[in-house]
Amino acid sequence: RQERLAKLFTEAVRRWDVSFTENLPDYMKELVSFFRKGWEDYLLGYYEEAEWLAAEYVPSLDEYIK
């Protein structure tokens, strides 16, 4: 059972397919959601940096850290 859950969890994270989490316990569903949100925030940060670069804008330290 644990091995099956581990495989389901790993596939859910790899695919980012929320429907793939249907057979996971609630705590694992929350982890998939947490990882997905973290990845989204990470990518949005890079997107903002790319916009700054394209506009030749140098953000303040506070903007950059945010």
Curated annotation (Swiss-Prot):
Disulfide bonds: none
Named cofactor requirement(s): Mn(2+); K(+)
Catalytic activity as recorded in UniProt: (2E,6E)-farnesyl diphosphate = (E,R)-alpha-bisabolene + diphosphate
GO MF annotations in UniProt: alpha-bisabolene synthase activity; metal ion binding
EC number: 4.2.3.38
Keyword annotations from UniProtKB, A to Z: Cytoplasm, Lyase, Manganese, Metal-binding
Pfam families found in the cross-reference section: Terpene_syn_C_2
Annotated localization: Cytoplasm
CC terms in the record's Gene Ontology section: cytoplasm
Keyword Metal-binding attached: yes
Pathway participation: Terpene metabolism; oleoresin biosynthesis
Family to which this protein belongs: Belongs to the terpene synthase family. Tpsd subfamily.
Function: Involved in defensive oleoresin formation in conifers in response to insect attack or other injury. Involved in sesquiterpene (C15) olefins biosynthesis.
Name of the protein in its database record: Alpha-bisabolene synthase
Native source species: Pseudotsuga menziesii (Douglas-fir)
